């Protein structure tokens, strides 16, 4: 199938409430459609983001939080580079249900717009790919990422 360039034309960007967003992701994850759409759209952000981490870090035992992990696309890329101390959180249980079982040590449903339930300096790295977008995670979440 030909790659699509949809930019910000996806209906998800028009949704306003958390309930609308959760319902959309529930429907989008059916029959693994989300993952197939990411392939069809040539979504390379997870691979590109992990390549930056690989370029600037040499330790493979870093404690990493994949914030807004979705179906685990960033975690999969991290595993390819031998990172294994990875936790993931996402707002959508439907997305989390599609995560391969061997990617994350801990996987939790959580709203990133609320204070995170982690101690200060709990992680060496917080990766957040594709979540700071229309109607999703707000800028104040960055303060929490820095704290943890």
Label the model's feature ranges.
Residues 62, 105, 124:
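Conserved acidic residues
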Residues 1-32:
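N-terminal, positively charged/glycine-rich alpha-helical extensions of SAM-dependent methyltransferases
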Residues 139-148:
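A short glycine-rich, Lys/Arg-flanked "PGG" loop and its adjoining helix->strand segment in the class I
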Residues 31-44:
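Class I SAM-dependent methyltransferase Rossmann-like catalytic core
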Residues 43-62:
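Conserved alpha-helix/loop element of class I SAM-dependent methyltransferases that forms part
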């Amino acid at each position: 199938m030909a790659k699509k360039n949809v930019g910000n034309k996806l209906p998800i960007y028009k949704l306003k409430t958390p309930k609308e967003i959760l319902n959309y992701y529930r429907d989008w994850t059916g029959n693994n459609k989300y993952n197939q759409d990411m392939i069809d759209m040539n979504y390379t952000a997870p691979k590109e983001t992990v390549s930056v981490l690989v370029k600037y870090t040499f330790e493979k035992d870093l404690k990493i939080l994949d914030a807004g992990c979705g179906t685990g696309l960033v975690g999969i890329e991290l595993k390819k580079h031998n990172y294994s101390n990875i936790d993931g959180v996402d707002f959508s249980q439907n997305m989390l249900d599609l995560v391969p079982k061997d990617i994350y040590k801990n996987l939790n449903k959580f709203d990133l717009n609320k204070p995170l339930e982690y101690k200060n300096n709990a992680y060496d790295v917080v990766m957040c790919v594709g979540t700071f977008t229309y109607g999703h995670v707000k800028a104040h979440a960055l303060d929490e990422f820095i704290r943890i």
